[in-house]
């Protein structure tokens, strides 16, 4: 009898946990769909830029560089220049 009484007491907690888990999964799925939509939009913008004669690889590099801190970007450029000089590319 104690087992069935414990099961009855756990039901609201179990239902809450199931509902919470379902809500979390649904939020993740919704965000994944939004991420896919945004990714498609970004791809369309790059295609538009390419259609207008812009170099997509250069645009991607600029976008990546703009995300960096100015000091980090300067350090990366210095390292790149050092390597290029060592290889006789400058």
From Swiss-Prot:
GO molecular function annotations of the record: DNA binding
Superkingdom field: Bacteria
InterPro entries: GapR-like, GapR-like_DNA-bd
Sequence similarity: Belongs to the UPF0335 family.
NCBIfam families per the UniProt record, alphabetical: PRK13694.1
UniProt-recorded name of the protein: UPF0335 protein RPB_1426
Record organism: Rhodopseudomonas palustris (strain HaA2)
